[in-house]
Amino acid sequence: MAELPHRIIKETQRLLAEPVPGIKAEPDESNARYFHVVIAGESKDSPFEGGTFKRELLLAEEYPMAAPKVRFMTKIYHPNVDKLERISLDILKDKWSPALQIRTVLLSIQALLNAPNPDDPLANDVVEQWKTNEAQAIETARAWTRLYAMNSI
């Protein structure tokens, strides 16, 4: 494996030394470009409150010129996450900038988790329900959180 760029080493050291509240991110023992991430649903009144959501984050060889790849590993009912657990977040697509860091990506995912954006959907069936019957969509999201995200502590 190629030597890790200094930037990735520094970002990883900072993540481990100064963890973001509600987020745990650790590099894999065998691949320092692959991170095991757990983000807690902490926002009051969020349907994801109390859940712990696992993700995987992969830094491509081109990082930071290319955005990290992020996928949910915990099933979630969210308009910005599709059935393949891919996430729709502008900074992971057309708004990516090499000035952004892993920490920024994780904070943005945490914010999106707590405040879904139906105007940038990835899961059309979920966003349809979110727009036509938000109360039912929120209840479904709470049920999925209880079912899939509260069983691992």
UniProtKB/Swiss-Prot annotation:
All residue ranges annotated as the UBC core domain in the record: 3-150
GO terms for cellular component: extracellular exosome; nucleus
GO-annotated molecular function: ubiquitin conjugating enzyme activity
InterPro entries per UniProt: Ub_conjugating_enzyme, UBQ-conjugat_E2_core, UBQ-conjugating_enzyme/RWD
Record SUPFAM superfamilies: UBC-like
UniProt cross-references to Gene3D superfamilies, sorted A to Z: Ubiquitin Conjugating Enzyme
GO biological process, one term: protein polyubiquitination
Alphabetical UniProt keywords: Acetylation
Family annotation (Pfam families): UQ_con (PF00179)
N6-acetyllysine modifications at: K83
Tissue: Expressed in epididymis (at protein level).
Family (UniProt): Belongs to the ubiquitin-conjugating enzyme family.
Protein's name according to its UniProt entry: Putative ubiquitin-conjugating enzyme E2 N-like
Species annotation: Homo sapiens
Gene: UBE2NL
